[in-house]
């Protein structure tokens, strides 16, 4: 972080800039009255965006105590946080449109600023937005207007993308996951998947975030008919209505990138569903829902299993290539000194995707009395010159990366539980 930018951000906050901007927005400016005032509102929003860019951690305080210098004259983190809550309230209640036709440049920009703030802020501010201002409901209502009819104008397209970003930022918090389920967020995302519009990819991302380390969401997803839609996307049987623009090559690149993103989202969601539905659970309902996932992999001569292996192999190849490349770059360096950089490079190449594929394969392997799956896994791995040992090594590295499991427990699937799940899968894979 540039120290000059950090200093400038602190000075601006010291001078109560947030309060000045909020007073301008709520007092003297009304974007609906004239073009001049509409332009002024846009400029104020631009100042907010630039302010966040100066020093996100210092301006929001993250989840730690903010220094008196950064927190303003009141000298407290809470006063700074309250200023941001007021900004969020203004954006949510006054700048977000209630109808599709009302999305203009200011509404689009307000949704962008809202997303930027929530992505940059710490969990405490996101939780307050959820609990005090109904943030999840705000996002769901904004998205609901596009559940069957796609956006038509450039402003509507960007507005929809921004509101999905808002929802995903919120879904990093447990409180938001709970509100998402209560507000029928799963049902709304299912409608987006059925609509086969460009919003489908964003809907998958939301479901991925909602099901991550939150067991309750897994059961709801199965109940609401997600599996059929999820596998249709994963297998490429549910195409999105033409959205890519430009020449043929550009369209092909965009479509390939979208296709790949959707595949890895599907795998991640499946991994989350298995974790949330708990193997060996005494709950009959959870066991039955888990079995419904397994049954999907048994259909059509194990085609979904083969697809899963194919996806894993693609990313494993990229990771291996990157590992070799970066090994040459750091040749002669102490291994401990470059360990973090090597790991980051492998993650960028797709290591996490390989790990998620391995988890799903191991979950299928661990299913009782499904010998066809075990035979299929061994056979398909052998076809690509891999064995169960590769799965075990991948999962062992992943379990080690989970650390000491000090993350917040969320419905039994966070922190320690996530590591226990992976260790259980490793043990059930046995010896190669």
Model-based region annotation:
Residues 217-432:
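Alpha-solenoid helical-repeat scaffold
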Residues 1, 28, 41-55, 107-121, ...:
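Hydrophobic residues within the alpha-helices of tandem HEAT/HEAT-like
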Residues 55-57, 128-129, 199, 203, ...:
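Short, highly charged low-complexity linear segments
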Residues 114, 155, 164, 205, ...:
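Amphipathic, alpha-helical segments enriched in basic
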Residues 34-44, 103, 107, 126, ...:
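Residue-level detector of extended alpha-helical repeat arrays and alpha-solenoid scaffolds
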Residues 137-250:
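A compositional/structural signature marking long, glycine- and acidic/polar-rich segments
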Residues 17-25, 48, 84-95, 138-143, ...:
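Buried hydrophobic core positions in alpha-solenoid tandem helical repeats
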Residues 1-109, 119-137, 153, 170-183, ...:
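Elongated alpha-helical scaffolds that mediate protein-protein interactions in large eukaryotic proteins
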């Amino acid at each position: 972080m540039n120290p000059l930018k950090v200093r400038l951000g602190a000075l601006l906050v010291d001078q109560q800039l947030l309060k000045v901007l909020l007073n301008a927005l709520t007092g003297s400016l009304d974007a609906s009255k004239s073009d001049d005032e509409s332009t002024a509102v846009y400029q104020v929003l631009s100042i907010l965006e630039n302010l966040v860019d100066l020093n996100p951690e210092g301006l929001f305080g993250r989840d730690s105590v903010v220094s008196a210098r950064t927190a303003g004259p009141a000298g407290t983190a809470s006063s700074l946080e309250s200023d941001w809550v007021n900004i969020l309230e203004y954006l949510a209640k006054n700048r977000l449109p209630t109808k599709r036709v009302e999305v203009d440049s200011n509404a689009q920009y307000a949704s962008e600023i809202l997303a930027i703030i929530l992505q940059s802020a710490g969990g405490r501010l996101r939780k307050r937005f959820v609990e005090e201002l109904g943030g999840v409901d705000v996002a769901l209502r904004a998205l609901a207007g596009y559940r069957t009819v796609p956006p038509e104008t450039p402003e509507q397209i960007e507005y929809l993308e921004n509101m999905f970003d808002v929802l995903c930022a919120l879904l990093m918090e447990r409180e938001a996951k709970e509100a998402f389920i209560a507000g029928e967020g799963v049902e709304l995302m299912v409608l987006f998947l059925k609509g086969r519009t460009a919003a489908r990819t964003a809907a998958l991302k939301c479901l991925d975030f909602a099901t991550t380390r939150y067991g309750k969401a897994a059961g709801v997803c199965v109940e609401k008919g997600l599996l059929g839609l999820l596998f249709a996307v994963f297998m490429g049987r549910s195409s999105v209505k033409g959205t890519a623009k430009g020449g043929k090559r550009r369209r092909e690149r965009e479509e390939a990138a979208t296709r790949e993103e959707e595949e890895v989202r599907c795998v991640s969601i499946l991994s989350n569903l298995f974790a949330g539905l708990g193997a060996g659970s005494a709950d009959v309902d959870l066991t039955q829902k888990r079995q419904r996932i397994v049954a999907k992999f048994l259909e059509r001569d194990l085609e979904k299993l083969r697809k899963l292996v194919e996806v894993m192999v693609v990313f494993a190849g990229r990771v291996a290539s990157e590992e070799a490349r970066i090994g040459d770059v750091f040749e002669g360096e102490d291994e401990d000194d470059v360990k973090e950089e090597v790991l980051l490079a492998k993650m960028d190449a797709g290591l996490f995707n390989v790990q998620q594929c391995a988890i799903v394969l191991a979950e299928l392997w661990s299913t009782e009395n499904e010998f066809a799956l075990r035979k299929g896994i061994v056979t398909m791995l052998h076809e690509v010159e891999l064995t169960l040992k590769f799965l075990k090594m991948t999962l062992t590295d992943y379990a080690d990366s989970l650390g000491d499991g000090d993350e917040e427990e969320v419905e039994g699937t966070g922190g320690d539980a996530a590591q226990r799940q992976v260790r259980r899968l490793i043990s059930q894979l046995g010896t190669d």
